[in-house]
Amino acid sequence: MTHELDATGLLCPLPVLKARKRLRALEPGGLLVLRTDDPAAIIDVPHFCAEAGHHLETQAEDGNAMIWTIRRG
């Protein structure tokens, strides 16, 4: 099952903190789709995934927003 988190309008570190909380609730291998328009997320989200042991599956642009698919490690 894929879970979604819309963090549009939130500035870092809030998108990463909310993603961390949501990922903790998922089983290993679970998917989270994170949407954010924070420009700092381009650096923060991949760094968070690498540090926390999660796998960044996809990264895409949608207008002013970025959409990340993260698989829980």
Feature locations, PLM:
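Amphipathic, hydrophobic secondary-structure cores in small proteins
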Residues: 7-58
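Core SAM-dependent methyltransferase catalytic element
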Residues: 67-73
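Right-handed parallel beta-helix/beta-solenoid
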Residues: 1-6
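Short acidic/glycine-enriched loop/turn segments that link adjacent beta-strands
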Residues: 63-65
